[in-house]
Amino acid sequence: MATVDRWLLPDGIEEVLPPEAARIEIARRQVLDLFQSWGYELVVTPHIEYLESLLTGAGQDLDQRTFKVVDPQSGRLMGFRADFTPQVARIDAHTLRREGPSRLCYAGSVLHAQPRALSTSRSPIQLGAELYGDASPTSDVEVISLMLATLQLADVPDVHMDLGHVGIYRGLARAAGLSGAVEQQLFDAMQRKAVDEVQALTADLPKDLGSMLRALVELCGGREVLAEARVRLGRAPASVLAALDDLLAIADRLASRYPDLPLYFDLGELRGYHYHTGVVFAVFVPGEGQSIAQGGRYDDIGADFGRARPATGFSTDLKTLVTLGRAEVVLPTGGIWMPDSGDAALWQQVCQLRNEGQRVVQALPGQPLSAALEADCDRQLIQQDGRWQVLPLAQ
């Protein structure tokens, strides 16, 4: 084996070195403290588990992003988690089984067989929050607000938000009686804004339904889109009109809380269509081709675990937040150099200093005092007048 093969990492897999690792860890603690202040409880899920459980209710997209291995003990297929949401949904539905709303959060590494885009990591540190047990737009607004608070904590500049609702397309497609194959083709064409293809796929539908489905490609822009949608989708099924009402209620609340936040509406945006059931949202910043935070409603995700519950949530990549954010992360600097000594009094003082939050580095046999500088120490323990004292490091 060539030497280079011993340290070469796979594409999209990276290691994090000091001091960047310290910045990420400090940011993780700050975000989890933020989640806790909003009433969200931390859960820790397995890195790997049986595939049937890991992919339940998650859709085809997650299946394609999941690394799969065979468990040598059981012979069953297992997968490394590519997304926390199915696992957290299982905890809510099967383990906690609470009657009222449940607020849960998480932070940890995930592994992707395929990256979201060519330039993105396959080993992001995913963090997010999920609210179970309430189907109202109020829960969606809470989750979106927490997402924005997370970005504000990291001081990510120039954010703007995209909002959509997969229930609009889903309701029209159901009313049109589209076959699974045609619905998938139309879905693909919608995502590419391929107007000619959408026209061809809806040409044989009843006039009103075909016209409304074609309108989704054009219904994108500022807040005026919602008023226009009310007119162009006025003959839509009740579920579609209810979805528009929910989207308007969410937009009103967000505009009240964040008057300077640019909101963009795209009723043909079907991000997570096989996974989400209602409102979908994503945050973008200039210069980034992918969303930096995203989420939406995924009601009844716990049904396969024996308990269907309304659910809404968001996720983001912690490493991306630290990279894009302007928040100053103050790293601890300096330290105390401890000589190599078996003196019990020295050890007692070192323990006390560490308990007080001081950083104390043990000198190893043969290390000169100059090694203290490499260890980022600016003070040293010196025995004077029969006791150990912390003094400036002798240059």
Curated annotation (Swiss-Prot):
Q: Where in the cell is it found?
A: Cytoplasm
Q: Keywords, A to Z?
A: Amino-acid biosynthesis, Cytoplasm, Histidine biosynthesis
| Presence of the UniProt keyword Oxidoreductase in the record | no
Q: Which residues form the signal peptide?
A: none
**Disulfides per UniProt:** none
What Gene3D superfamilies does this protein map onto? Bira Bifunctional Protein, Domain 2
| Chief location | cytoplasm
| InterPro entries named among the record's database cross-references | aa-tRNA-synth_II/BPL/LPL, HisRS-like_core, HisRS/HisZ, HisZ
Q: Which GO terms describe its biological process?
A: L-histidine biosynthetic process
The family database entries (Pfam families) matched by this protein are listed as: tRNA-synt_His
Functional pathway? Amino-acid biosynthesis; L-histidine biosynthesis; L-histidine from 5-phospho-alpha-D-ribose 1-diphosphate: step 1/9
Gene Ontology CC: one annotated term: cytoplasm
Miscellaneous comment as given in the Swiss-Prot or TrEMBL entry = This function is generally fulfilled by the C-terminal part of HisG, which is missing in some bacteria such as this one.
Q: What does this protein do?
A: Required for the first step of histidine biosynthesis. May allow the feedback regulation of ATP phosphoribosyltransferase activity by histidine.
Q: Which family does it belong to?
A: Belongs to the class-II aminoacyl-tRNA synthetase family. HisZ subfamily.
Q: How does it assemble?
A: Heteromultimer composed of HisG and HisZ subunits.
Record's NCBIfam families?
A: hisZ_biosyn_reg, PRK12292.1-1, PRK12292.1-4, PRK12421.1
What name does this protein carry? Answer: ATP phosphoribosyltransferase regulatory subunit
The gene that this protein is the product of is hisZ
